[in-house]
Curated annotation (Swiss-Prot):
Glycosylation site positions: N133, N320, N406, N433
Coarse class of the protein's main subcellular location: membrane
Lipid-modified sites (GPI-anchor amidated serine): S510
Record flagged with keyword Glycoprotein: yes
Designated name of the protein: Netrin-G1
C-alpha cells in the first residue's frame, strides 16, 4: 500500500515538473549581468547577457481614445442588454462614479463582482459607423512575452484590427484582423495561428475565432504570442535555444514581438444577427473590462531592471552602455562598435560589453573626485584610484565607511558624502545606513544613537534606570539623582539606600542605636533582578 502511494506521488511530481519546467525555463534565465568568478589570476568579472523580468506592462501605459468624446455618460444615456433588447434600464452617467465607465477601468483589478469596464456611447447615429481607436503607449520599446488578452463586457466586436507601432505612433502596421466574416470585412481568407508555420509565422492573418457575437463564455480576444514562440521552441516551449537562436539572427522576427505602442481599432460592434435593429440602437456599443499585456523593457540584453520615473520607463544599463534601450556605448567606452547582447550560448549568452576607448584611459570618469584611474584588463574595466572627498568605488560613486550619501548633492559635488557622526557611546560602530541612521546599542535610540529609550538614562551611554521616583523609589530618605543613583543619608548605603551602613562594619545592634535592616521592598527586588541581568553599573 505504501509503495503504491509512493509511486503515485512520484508520478504526480514527475507530471507537475514536466508541465512546469518549460515555463520556468523560458523566463528564468538572463537575470544577472555580471558576477564574480574565481580563476587562477584571482577574482574577475564574468559578464553575461541579461534582461528585465517579464511583468504586467499595463501598469506603465498611457491610454488615448479617438474620438476623445466616445466614452458613454456625457450626456447620460441608457443602454440595453445585448442578449435582450427590451432590457434597457442600464444607465451610463459620467458624473456619477457608480454609473461611470471611464477608460482606466480597462486596466484595474478584475477580482470583484460585478466587473468594472470602459464603455463607449451607443450606436445612436446609425448608419454612420461606430468606430473607436484605443491607443496604448509606453514611450519606450518593449518586448512582448505572453498573449495579448482583451476581455469584452459586451459582445466581442464583429470587426476589429489590432495594430502595432515601433516608432512611438508615427507609423502603424497591422498585427491581426478579427471579423465574423473575414472575406467580407477585409477581403482576406480566414485563418488561425495553427495554420501558420516557422516560415509563415510573420504572416498577418484574419481570424474568425474570436468574433462570434455575444455569449457569457465568449468575451475574450487573444493575440497569440506563445503559439508563435512554439513554432521554434516546441509545443511546451522546451527548446528555447532554437527560439533564442532565431531571435538573435532574424531581425524581422525580433521586431515582430517588439512594440512601442499598440492600437485596438474597433470597427463594428457586436450585432448578433445579419441586420442592425434600428429600433433598438441602444443595444449596440463597445465595452471592455480588461486588457492584459505582459512583456519587458527592451534593453538589448544589457540590463536586468527598468526604472519607472516621472511616467517614463528607462533601462538601468550595464556593460558600459547607455540610452533608454541601452542602445549605445557610454562616453569613453567606444573602443569597439556597440552591439546588443546575445542569447547564445545557452544559458548565459554573450554580453558584448562596450570597452574603453584608447584615448579615454587618461580621462577618468570619477565624478571629479579623482584624476587618476587604471584600466584593469583582467576585469575589462577602468577603476578610479585615490578617490577624494570621502568617496570610494569604481567611479568614486560610493561613500567611505562612516559616511553616507548627501541626497541633495550631485555625484560630482565635493560634499556628496556626509560623515555619519554616530555617538561612540551609544552606537555599535561608526557606520550608518544610506539615510544617515546609525546602529544603536541596547537602550539607545535616535538617528545618531544619542538618545535613550524609556526606562534608560544617559550616563556614559544609556544605562537602565536605578531610580525614577515612580516605580523605583530610593528608600530610607534617599534622593534619586539623574535616575542613575540614590544619594543616601549617612546611616544608609546600597543601590536604593536599603542597607544600614553599620552592617558593613558588623557593628549593628542595640548599642549602636540602629535597628535591624528593613525588609526588602518589591521595588528593590525588581531592581535587583534587573541589575542581575544587566551587569554591574559604574557610579
Amino acid at each position: 500500500m505504501y509503495l503504491s502511494r509512493f509511486l503515485s506521488i512520484h508520478a504526480l511530481w514527475v507530471t507537475v515538473s514536466s508541465v512546469m519546467q518549460p515555463y520556468l525555463f523560458v523566463w528564468g534565465h538572463y537575470d544577472v549581468c555580471k558576477s564574480l568568478i574565481y580563476t587562477e589570476e584571482g577574482k574577475v568579472w564574468d559578464y553575461t547577457a541579461c534582461q528585465p523580468e517579464s511583468t504586467d506592462m499595463t501598469k506603465y501605459l498611457k491610454v488615448k481614445l479617438d474620438p476623445p468624446d466616445i466614452t458613454c455618460g456625457d450626456p447620460p444615456e441608457s443602454f440595453c442588454a445585448m442578449g435582450n433588447p427590451y432590457m434597457c434600464n442600464n444607465e451610463c452617467d459620467a458624473s456619477t462614479p457608480e454609473l461611470a465607465h471611464p477608460p482606466e477601468l480597462m486596466f484595474d483589478f478584475e477580482g470583484r463582482h460585478p466587473s468594472t469596464f470602459w464603455q463607449s456611447a451607443t450606436w445612436k447615429e446609425y448608419p454612420k459607423p461606430l468606430q473607436v481607436n484605443i491607443t496604448l503607449s509606453w514611450s519606450k520599446t518593449i518586448e512582448l512575452t505572453d498573449n495579448i488578452v482583451i476581455t469584452f463586457e459586451s459582445g466581442r466586436p464583429d470587426q476589429m484590427i489590432l495594430e502595432k507601432s515601433l516608432d512611438y505612433g508615427r507609423t502603424w502596421q497591422p498585427y491581426q484582423y478579427y471579423a465574423t466574416d473575414c472575406l467580407h470585412a477585409f477581403h482576406m481568407d480566414p485563418k488561425s495561428v495553427k495554420d501558420l508555420s516557422q516560415h509563415t509565422v510573420l504572416e498577418i492573418i484574419c481570424t474568425e475565432e474570436y468574433s462570434t457575437g455575444y455569449s457569457t463564455n465568449s468575451k475574450i480576444i487573444h493575440f497569440e504570442i506563445k503559439d508563435r514562440f512554439a513554432f521554434f521552441a516546441g509545443p511546451r516551449l522546451r527548446n528555447m535555444a532554437s527560439l533564442y537562436g532565431q531571435l538573435d539572427t532574424t531581425k524581422k522576427l525580433r521586431d515582430f514581438f517588439t512594440v512601442t505602442d499598440l492600437r485596438i481599432r474597433l470597427l463594428r460592434p457586436a450585432v448578433g444577427e445579419i441586420f442592425v435593429d434600428e429600433l433598438h440602437l441602444a443595444r449596440y456599443f463597445y465595452a471592455i473590462s480588461d486588457i492584459k499585456v505582459r512583456g519587458r523593457c527592451k534593453c538589448n540584453l544589457h540590463a536586468t531592471s527598468c526604472l519607472y520615473d516621472n511616467s517614463k520607463l528607462t533601462c538601468e544599463c550595464e556593460h558600459n552602455t547607455t540610452g533608454p534601450d541601452c542602445g549605445k556605448c557610454k562616453k569613453n567606452y567606444q573602443g569597439r562598435p556597440w552591439s546588443p547582447g546575445s542569447y547564445l550560448p545557452i544559458p548565459k549568452g554573450t554580453a558584448n560589453t562596450c570597452i574603453p576607448s584608447i584615448s579615454s584611459i587618461g580621462n577618468c570618469e570619477c565624478f571629479g573626485h579623482s584624476n587618476r584611474c587604471s584600466y584593469i584588463d583582467l576585469l575589462n574595466t577602468v577603476i578610479c584610484v585615490s578617490c577624494k572627498h570621502n568617496t570610494r568605488g569604481q567611479h568614486c560613486e560610493l561613500c567611505r565607511l562612516g559616511y553616507f550619501r548627501n541626497a541633495s548633492a550631485q555625484l560630482d559635488d565635493e560634499n556628496v558624502c556626509i560623515e555619519c557622526y554616530c555617538n561612540p557611546l551609544g552606537s555599535i560602530h561608526d557606520r550608518c545606513n544610506g539615510s544617515g541612521f546609525c546602529e544603536c546599542k541596547t537602550g539607545t535610540t535616535g538617528p545618531k544613537c544619542d538618545e535613550c529609550l524609556p526606562g534608560n538614562s544617559w550616563y556614559y551611554g544609556c544605562q537602565p534606570n536605578v531610580c525614577d521616583n515612580e516605580l523605583l523609589h530610593c528608600q530610607n530618605g534617599g534622593t534619586c539623582q539623574n535616575n542613575v543613583r540614590c544619594a543616601c543619608p549617612d546611616a544608609y548605603t546600597g543601590i536604593l539606600c536599603e542597607k544600614l551602613r553599620c552592617e558593613e562594619a558588623g557593628s549593628c545592634g542595640s548599642e549602636s542605636g540602629q535597628g535591624a535592616p528593613p525588609r526588602g521592598s518589591p521595588a528593590l527586588l525588581l531592581l535587583t533582578m534587573l541589575l542581575g541581568t544587566a551587569g554591574p553599573l559604574v557610579f
